């Protein structure tokens, strides 16, 4: 079992823990300005407590040869100059940088141009084809039989004319040896049509003299002096342009510009509108107050409450009168007698006890002789089936006839 290396000898009872470990001591019990004030740290107690002469290597300090070579490798002046040059923009983009700085500084009413959505849509790539365009040719020509009829083949409607010409050329052609070469026959000598002394032919010397040549020789590496500034590369210097008269826009031209057409004009909208024009402010009640005449929550009439009969407690007391159930529980009496303990007969006395027979007048059946056809039908239902028939009466109690 590996144990922690100790820097002291003679630990009592073979204990391997450190002697001044105060990490478990409460902070209120630690004394100030002593070792027990700070918790135990291996870095301060073990590693740094034994540093002394001869215990560390001087080659690893900041003045060692290896450290100085690393710091002085490329040169601090050259590194600083290179970092400065990398932050500078290329001279081709310096004009663009100045223009952007002026745009950032020159901000205010009328100093910028806000394009509407129609102008932005025109800048986007568009297609000439519409939504219903399929790209197919509208009229593709004749559909059906593409073969022409008789009399439309060959020269002047005769298809055998070309065949006769080919057979004639084969029979009257050149010999076999003449037809082997693919070169065309030599043309006859034709003149240019110019007379003597009407044109000038330049000699070889005149042609060589008029030939354009450069001023640099074969060993000229640079077309200029060595001390002149470098025209290209990272260390190049921008060439100064010759001073010319520049044309600046006058105040009248800027005022009549198309993006300043509506500036300075009177608006048709009120300066302080009652309701804001932007819909984003319509949700806030303080910025967009509601109209008083418009119906809304709380604009209707409240319901009328009915006045119910309430039996007030006697002698204008604030406490409620105890009910029958409370008297039975507290007093144990089933027939309480006292002020206000009798039955309230006020409601019973006001009941209307008159009897009305309204059902006679609200019945649906009609009176007699209201509808003659219907009354006749009802009379047939109650007519006996023996009406109009005279059957002999038989007395079953008497003797039968012989």
UniProtKB/Swiss-Prot annotation:
Signal peptide feature range: none
Database matches in InterPro entries: CIMAP2, SHIPPO-rpt
Species of provenance: Rattus norvegicus
PANTHER family xrefs: LYMPHOCYTE EXPANSION MOLECULE (PTHR34914:SF1)
Gene: Cimap2
Name recorded for this polypeptide: Ciliary microtubule-associated protein 2
Disulfide bonding pattern of the chain: none
Domain of life of the native organism: Eukaryota
């Amino acid at each position: 079992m590996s144990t922690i290396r100790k820097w002291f000898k003679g630990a009592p009872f073979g204990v391997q823990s450190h002697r001044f470990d105060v990490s478990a001591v409460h902070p209120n019990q630690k004394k100030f300005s002593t070792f027990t004030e700070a918790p135990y740290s291996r870095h301060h107690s073990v590693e740094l407590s034994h540093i002394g002469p001869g215990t560390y290597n001087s080659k690893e300090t900041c003045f060692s040869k290896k450290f100085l070579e690393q710091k002085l490798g490329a040169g601090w002046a050259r590194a600083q100059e290179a970092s400065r040059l990398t932050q500078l923009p290329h001279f081709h983009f310096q004009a663009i940088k100045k223009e952007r700085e002026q745009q950032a500084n020159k901000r205010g009413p009328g100093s910028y141009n806000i394009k509407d959505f129609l102008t932005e849509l025109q800048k986007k790539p568009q297609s000439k084809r519409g939504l219903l365009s399929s790209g197919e040719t509208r009229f593709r020509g004749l559909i059906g039989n593409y073969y022409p009829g008789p009399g439309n083949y060959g020269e002047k409607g005769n298809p055998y004319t070309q065949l006769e010409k080919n057979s004639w050329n084969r029979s009257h052609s050149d010999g076999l040896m003449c037809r082997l070469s693919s070169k065309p026959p030599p043309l006859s000598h034709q003149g240019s049509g110019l007379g003597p002394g009407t044109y000038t032919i330049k000699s070889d010397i005149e042609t060589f003299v008029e030939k354009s040549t450069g001023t640099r020789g074969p060993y000229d590496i640079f077309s200029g002096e060595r001390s002149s500034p470098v025209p290209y590369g990272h260390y190049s210097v921008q060439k100064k342009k010759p001073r010319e008269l520049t044309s600046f826009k006058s105040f009248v031209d800027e005022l009549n510009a198309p993006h300043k057409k509506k500036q300075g004009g009177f608006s048709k909208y009120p300066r302080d509108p009652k309701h804001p024009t932007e819909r984003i402010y319509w949700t806030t009640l303080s910025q967009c107050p509601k109209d008083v005449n418009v119906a809304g929550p709380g604009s209707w009439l409240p319901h009328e409450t009915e006045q119910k009969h309430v039996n007030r407690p006697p002698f204008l007391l604030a406490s409620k009168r105890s009910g029958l159930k409370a008297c039975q529980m507290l007093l144990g009496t089933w027939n309480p007698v006292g002020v206000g303990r009798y039955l309230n007969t006020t409601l019973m006395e006001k009941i209307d006890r008159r009897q009305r027979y309204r059902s006679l007048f609200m019945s649906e059946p009609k009176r007699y002789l209201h509808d003659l056809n219907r009354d006749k039908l009802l009379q047939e239902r109650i007519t006996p089936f023996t009406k109009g028939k005279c059957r002999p009466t038989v007395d079953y109690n008497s003797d039968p006839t012989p």
